[in-house]
């Protein structure tokens, strides 16, 4: 009898402890969202047990839906879901991105989507960020359209502008379909007519003014719109030689200028292009190489259509 009573007491204690841990987990997630400094790696909040039901539904929707296969890059980056589709080295890198407390630079995704650092942007930018989070139509995908659109030609140098125009207009760059795939997502019915018109406009027009999001993220050209701390971080991302994991962003901008990276990094990029596995990781191939159709398999090309 005493033993049964002891077991019952132990059950209630452990049950209460589990509930306490759950509350702590959710509180940690809420703290990630609410805090203004946003110095931590906020993708931790996207773990299944650490997000709200609404966020979980969105995440599961991104994973399970059959269309818009190209959008799986988001799942790969956030959750490091590799299940045999990437090498051990890549898996270690992915897990490292998720688990480590540093890597402040990778917060750009959280900042842009969830508008976490309110004090670090202008009122106009804050309104845009809040709109991305709160509006009801296609919440998950609008950040891409707005990020790409929202800026003007006058905010970058002539050299940057030439690069952006070249990416859109040159005929050789067939592999740069990531822009088409991410914007259009091959599922027109999932956005409003206005958004669809914008997406088609981004694909067909020659000026491609909307490509400024990339320049702004990396080169911090609109200095007046961010704090000194953010400006230093942006410049640091471009100039520093460390933090190899974040070099994919620099690689996307500089389009494989071999002299601008180490041999090790170059080998990694070439490996991403040549191997046939890890289809979900094709966003990296597309964004880094931005090269020709011949560098992917027929099956991969079919997935992009």
Swiss-Prot record:
Official protein name in the record: Maximins-S type B/C
Disulfide bonds: none
Main location (coarse class): secreted
Keywords: Amidation, Antibiotic, Antimicrobial, Cleavage on pair of basic residues, Secreted, Signal
Tissue expression as described in the entry: Expressed by the skin dorsal glands.
GO cellular component: extracellular region
Signal peptide start-end: 1-18
């Amino acid at each position: 009898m005493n033993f049964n009573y002891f077991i019952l007491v132990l059950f209630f204690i452990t049950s209460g402890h589990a509930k306490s841990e759950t509350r702590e987990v959710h509180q940690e997630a809420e703290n990630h969202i609410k805090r203004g400094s946003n110095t931590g790696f906020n993708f931790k909040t996207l773990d299944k047990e650490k997000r709200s039901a609404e966020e979980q539904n969105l995440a599961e929707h991104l994973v399970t839906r059959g269309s818009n296969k190209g959008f799986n890059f988001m799942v790969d980056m956030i959750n490091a879901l590799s299940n045999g589709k990437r090498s051990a080295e890549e898996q270690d890198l992915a897990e490292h991105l998720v688990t480590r407390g540093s890597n402040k630079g990778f917060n750009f995704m959280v900042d842009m989507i969830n508008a976490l650092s309110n004090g670090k942007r202008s009122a106009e930018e804050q309104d845009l960020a809040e709109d991305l989070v709160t509006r009801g139509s296609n919440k998950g995908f609008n950040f891409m359209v707005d990020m790409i659109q929202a800026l003007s030609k006058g905010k970058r140098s002539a050299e940057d502008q030439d690069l952006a125009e070249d990416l859109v207009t040159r005929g050789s760059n067939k592999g740069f379909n990531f822009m088409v795939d991410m914007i259009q997502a091959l599922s027109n019915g999932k956005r409003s007519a206005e958004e669809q018109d914008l997406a088609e406009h981004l694909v067909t027009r020659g000026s491609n003014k909307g490509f400024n999001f990339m320049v702004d993220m990396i080169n911090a050209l609109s200095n007046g719109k961010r704090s000194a701390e953010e400006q230093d971080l942006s410049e640091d991302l471009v100039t520093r030689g460390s933090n190899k994991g974040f070099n994919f962003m620099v690689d996307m901008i500089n389009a494989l200028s071999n002299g601008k990276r180490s041999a090790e990094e170059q080998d990694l990029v070439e490996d991403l292009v040549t191997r046939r596995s890890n289809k979900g990781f094709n966003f990296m191939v597309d964004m880094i190489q931005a090269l020709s159709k011949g560098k992917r398999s027929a099956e991969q090309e079919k997935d992009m259509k």
